[in-house]
């Protein structure tokens, strides 16, 4: 004999409340005030009895589309393409669509997309980088009502789920590799070091601190692109061009260095081409290191030394967190789901290839001679 299907009357008896209260609580009619104790009793009774409102579907089923929104600052960077591939791989496997909001690092666009969230009603939101500081509070409030993950730098404290990266550690790793190879005069090329892009500054600071530890702080040249660049719509070759042009500027200025560190791999590849054009041999004359370990870096003719911080896996993890939070919400009929905060971080790894090497004897002799003359 089949088990009798539970009714709202059964739930009311189990919870010790009226049927009307059961109906209003499970329908989330919170214009009527109920104590947290009453809400939890009704919810627990409904779960124990396996009761569902007639025709009720969970949030995922009640939507025509299962949608996750991704805020991305640019679609021209291989780094962000890797992140998106990781996100979409997980989302598509679970039947979710991904809607990308390309903010182009423009606060006006970011604000516009944030306003649209109430209309779009996605099931989850992923920020591929830190929100603009002007919208941080708004994003934190949004995270109270919808699963939201930020792929960010660890040194900003937040109450939002995050896939973190300590860029200070990454910068230190880049510097330590060059120091261990004997490099003492180096240059760090980077996109604009703006208030919004403070994670870039963290990487630079980590790099400088490692040299400072060896008493070589003044031996690091920081070459940053003009802030106006971040206000332009990025081209496909924006980061490559920045790396090329900043390296050419260093050469034109006659600056002394035996190694160049690029904020990312595309900038480092731009530096490689500039050095090649100037007939400077890599790594015999100048070593080059990047960061991100994108596909191009492993191509045999490039073979760029870089730092791998597992970009695609970060995208996968961010989407996994979103899906877990959605499922967690759907197991509860009210807002009394347990509160959990996810914080995932990978340990970065040095990938030593052919663009870095020990300082040549000629460079060491020149350095010693100049130091003696001083």
Where are these regions (language model features)?
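Flexible loop/turn connectors
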Residues: 248-361
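An alpha-beta-alpha
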Residues: 174-216, 336-355
């Amino acid at each position: 004999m089949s088990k009798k299907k539970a009714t709202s009357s059964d739930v009311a008896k189990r919870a010790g409340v009226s049927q009307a209260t059961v109906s209003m609580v499970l329908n989330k009619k919170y214009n009527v005030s109920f104590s947290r104790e009453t809400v939890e009793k009704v919810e627990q009774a409904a779960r124990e009895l396996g009761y569902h409102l007639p025709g009720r579907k969970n949030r995922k089923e009640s939507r025509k589309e299962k949608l996750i929104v991704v805020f991305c600052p640019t679609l021209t960077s291989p780094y962000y393409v890797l992140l998106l591939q990781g996100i979409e791989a997980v989302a598509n496997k679970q039947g979710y669509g991904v809607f990308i909001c390309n903010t182009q690092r423009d606060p006006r666009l970011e604000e516009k997309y944030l306003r649209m969230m109430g209309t779009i009603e996605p099931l989850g939101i992923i920020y591929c980088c830190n929100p603009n500081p002007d919208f941080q509070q708004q994003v934190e409030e949004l995270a109270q009502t919808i699963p939201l993950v930020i792929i960010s730098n660890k040194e900003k404290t937040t109450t939002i789920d995050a896939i973190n990266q300590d860029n200070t550690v990454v910068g230190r790793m880049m510097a330590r590799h060059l120091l261990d190879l004997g490099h003492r005069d180096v240059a760090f090329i980077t996109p604009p070091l703006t208030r919004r892009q403070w994670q870039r500054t963290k990487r630079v600071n980590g790099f400088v601190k490692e040299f400072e530890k060896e008493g070589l702080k003044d031996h690091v040249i920081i070459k940053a692109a003009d802030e106006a660049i971040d206000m332009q719509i990025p081209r496909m070759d924006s980061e490559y061009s920045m790396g090329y042009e900043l390296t050419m500027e260093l050469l034109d200025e006659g600056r002394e260095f035996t190694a160049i560190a690029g904020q990312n791999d595309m900038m480092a590849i731009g530096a490689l081409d500039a050095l090649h054009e100037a007939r400077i041999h890599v790594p015999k004359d100048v070593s080059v290191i990047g960061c991100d370990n994108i596909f191009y870096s492993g191509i045999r003719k490039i073979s760029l030394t870089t730092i791998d911080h597992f970009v695609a896996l970060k995208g996968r993890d961010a989407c996994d967190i979103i899906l877990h939070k959605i499922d967690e919400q759907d197991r509860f009929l009210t807002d009394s789901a347990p509160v959990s905060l996810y914080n995932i971080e990978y340990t970065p790894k040095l990938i030593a290839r052919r663009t870095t090497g020990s300082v040549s004897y000629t460079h060491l002799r020149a350095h010693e001679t100049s130091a003696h003359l001083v």
